Amino acid sequence: MNNFDTLLQSIARTTVVCVGDLMLDEFVYGEVSRISPEAPAPVIAVQRSEINVGGAGNVARNIAALGARCIFVGLIGDDEAGRTLNAELASEARIEPLLVCDPARPTTRKVRFVSEHFSTHMLRADWETAAAASAEIEQRLLDAILSQLERADIVLLSDYAKGVLTVRVIATVIEAARKLGKRVIVDPKSANFAIYRGATLLTPNRKEFVTATRCAADSMDEIATAAQEAIAFADCEAMLVTQSEHGMTLVPRAGEPIHVPAMPAKVRDVSGAGDTVAAVLAVALAAGADWGTAMRAASAAAAVAVSKNGTAVVTPAELRRKILPHASLAAEDKIIGSDAELDLRLAEWRRDGLRVGFTNGCFDILHPGHVKVLTAARGACDRLIVGLNSDASVRRLKGESRPVQNERARAEVLAALEAVDLVAIFEEDTPLKLITRIEPSVLVKGGDYTREQVVGHEIVAARGGEVLLIDVLPGFSTTSLVEKAREGTS
C-alpha cells in the first residue's frame, strides 16, 4: 500500500510528451428490433450517443487522469470534429494540447453503433485519411515536439498509422530525446520495427508482434526468441508484447523475460485498452518504477478499462481498488476535488447500475446523531455522497465562531466512515447546485425536517427518486456540544 501510494505521488510530479494520431470516437447506443423495408439491413433505434477523445488523445487523457501532466502533439483537420477535439483536450487541466491543423485532410472520426443491452458492436463507420503528413505539416509537428522535449520526463509515441508519425518525425524525435537523456516508449503500428530504431521500449500487441516478426507467439519462449531478434533489429532496450486475456510479456535486451498475467475483469469494451496500457507504463516508468511494477500497474489499469463502455480513462482510485482489492479506499480518495472527478465517479457507478444516495450538512463535531443518519442513508442506497458546507458557508449559517474544525478536517473525518463513499464540499448556502449535478436516487435528511423543507426534493421527485427522513437521535446537537465545551460542562 505505502509503495503504491508513493508511486502515485511520484506520478503526479511527472510530465509526459505524447505524440500521435488523434481521433474522435463516437458511440451510438441503441437496439435492433426490425429489418428495414428498404433493404435487408437492420434498423437501429438510437437511444443515446456520446463522444470521446480517441487514439493518441485517449493516451493523453489517461496520462492526465493518473495525475501526470501531458504535453500532447497531434494533427486535426479544419472541421467540426477537429474543433471538438481541441475543445475537449483544452478542457483537461493536466493536458497541454499543441494541435497542428491541416485543412487538406479530415479529422479522423470513428462512429461505433453499439447494442445498449448487450454492449456489442454492430457497425463502425470511419472518416479518415491515412496518408503521411505533407512536408510542411511534418515540419510544423516537429517544431511543436522538439520545443517541448526538455520539459519531459519521458516521451510516448502512439502510432495509429494515420499520418502523424512519419519516418522522419519518428527518427528526429527519438534522436533528439536520446541526446537529452529522455526515454522513449512507442506503441507501434508499423510492421517494420526498424522505423522506431533507438526507442527505449516498443509495446506491440500480439497481432502486431506476429505480423512484424513472423513468429507464432504460442509460448513465452517463442516470444522471447523473436523479441530478442526484433530488439537487435530496432536497437531498443526492451519489447513488451500485450496478449489480451493472456497478460503481457516483457523481453529486455539484457536479463530474463517478465510475464504478468491478465487480471480478472468483466469485459464490456476493449476500445482503447492498449492506450491505457501505454499511458500507465509511461507514467510509472517516468516516476521511477521498475519494469515489473510498471507492468503490474498497466495490467490492473487494462482490467479496469475493458470493464467500461467506450474509450475510458482510469483514475488512481480505480487503480488502487484493482491492485489492492482487499484494502479500504483511502479516506483522501473519497474527498472530491473537482466537478470532473465527481462526474467520473458518478459515470462509473451508473454504468454498474448502482443506486446513488445524497445527504448533507456542516458536520462540525461528528456525534452519534450524525452517525445514525449517515448509516441509515447508506443502507438506503449502494453509494452515499455527503455534501459538506465549506468554512465560508458554515460561517454564514452558524456565525463567525463556527466552524470549530476547518472543512478539510471535517471532510477527512467523514471520509473515514465506512458508510460514506464520497465527500463533496460546496461553497453555497444550500447544496441545490450539487444535487442538480448528482441527480441522486435517494435524498436523505434528519427527521427534524419536513419533506418540503428538504433542499432539492423537487429535483429528486421529478426523476422518480425518494426523499427519506431519518428520525433524529435526541440529546445530540453540534451547537449544544460547542456550548457545553465553552462552559466547561459535560
Swiss-Prot record:
First-tier enzyme category under EC: transferase
Binding site for ATP: 205-208
Gene Ontology BP annotations: ADP-L-glycero-beta-D-manno-heptose biosynthetic process
GO cellular component: cytosol
Pathway field: Nucleotide-sugar biosynthesis; ADP-L-glycero-beta-D-manno-heptose biosynthesis; ADP-L-glycero-beta-D-manno-heptose from D-glycero-beta-D-manno-heptose 7-phosphate: step 1/4; Nucleotide-sugar biosynthesis; ADP-L-glycero-beta-D-manno-heptose biosynthesis; ADP-L-glycero-beta-D-manno-heptose from D-glycero-beta-D-manno-heptose 7-phosphate: step 3/4
Alphabetical list of Pfam families matching this protein: CTP_transf_like (PF01467), PfkB (PF00294)
GO molecular-function terms, A-Z: ATP binding; heptose 7-phosphate kinase activity; heptose-1-phosphate adenylyltransferase activity; phosphotransferase activity, alcohol group as acceptor
Keywords: ATP-binding, Carbohydrate metabolism, Kinase, Multifunctional enzyme, Nucleotide-binding, Nucleotidyltransferase, Transferase
Active site per the UniProt annotation: 275
Function: Catalyzes the ADP transfer from ATP to D-glycero-beta-D-manno-heptose 1-phosphate, yielding ADP-D-glycero-beta-D-manno-heptose.
HAMAP family noted in UniProt: HldE (MF_01603)
Similarity comment: family membership: In the N-terminal section; belongs to the carbohydrate kinase PfkB family. In the C-terminal section; belongs to the cytidylyltransferase family.
Record's protein name: Bifunctional protein HldE
Organism, as annotated: Rhodopseudomonas palustris (strain HaA2)
Gene name linked to the record: hldE
